[in-house]
Amino acid sequence: MGVEKMKAAFENGKKAFIPYVMGGDGGLEKLKERIRFLDEAGASIVEIGIPFSDPVADGPTIQRAGKRALDGGVTLKGIFQALAEVRKEVQIPFVLMTYLNPVLAFGKEHFIERCLEAGVDGIIVPDLPYEEQDIIAPLLRTANIALIPLVTVTSPIERIEKITSESEGFVYAVTVAGVTGVRQNFKEEIHSYLEKVKSHTNLPVVAGFGISTKEHVEEMITICDGVVVGSKIIELLENEKREEICEFIQATKQKEEA
């Protein structure tokens, strides 16, 4: 499990499609069922959001999903239990997207113990600056759980090199300024930014934030090693448009074979 399992998602030129689901949106049984569906549909990795009351990096769709989960009484303990149960049925790598506050409130050591029990392979902490990652990075390294770095369009080359040189799993390249959410298109400089990130790390580079159409997927996958689709996946799951999710996954696979 852990770092090696995520490496396998990118082996031999594979392109990774990484859908995002909000933990507990619709209940914990729904979370398990959605993970089973995404695994069967051919997703490479599943990113599970931990609902939080002050989600500064999230756009309106993900904020609403998190609020639904919290209003429904979902807890971090409950999410870990659901993941541990569904882990027995699926092999797909789990990556948690969590803000730092829930980790600290739960207790760092306890959080990582539960990650191990639930079969979590990596975590993303969007509000944890690189300079402060020692709050949790050594514990994760010991547990063989990847702390996945985020880099942005405004990150200088030196910072990208520094961040990625000490990281594992993959690099999450944020493709827009601001919060997550559906976008119509991407500025041309995004291409050169992604190529810059790719040229300064040996890790797979995954594009995320704002990717919401098959055309976006096809555009990004020609430059990157994978894509994260969040807000759009939440919308499609909420409206039971699962065939469209399968089309997203197929678009990734077709680019892989091209």
Curated annotation (Swiss-Prot):
Its EC number is 4.2.1.20. It comes from the Bacteria. The keyword Lyase applies. Belongs to the TrpA family. This is Tryptophan synthase alpha chain. It comes from Bacillus cereus (strain AH187). The keyword Amino-acid biosynthesis applies. HAMAP family: Trp_synth_alpha (MF_00131). The gene is trpA. InterPro entries: Aldolase_TIM, RibuloseP-bd_barrel, Trp_synthase_alpha_AS, Trp_synthase_suA. The active site is at E47, D58. SUPFAM superfamilies: Ribulose-phoshate binding barrel. GO terms for cellular component: cytosol.
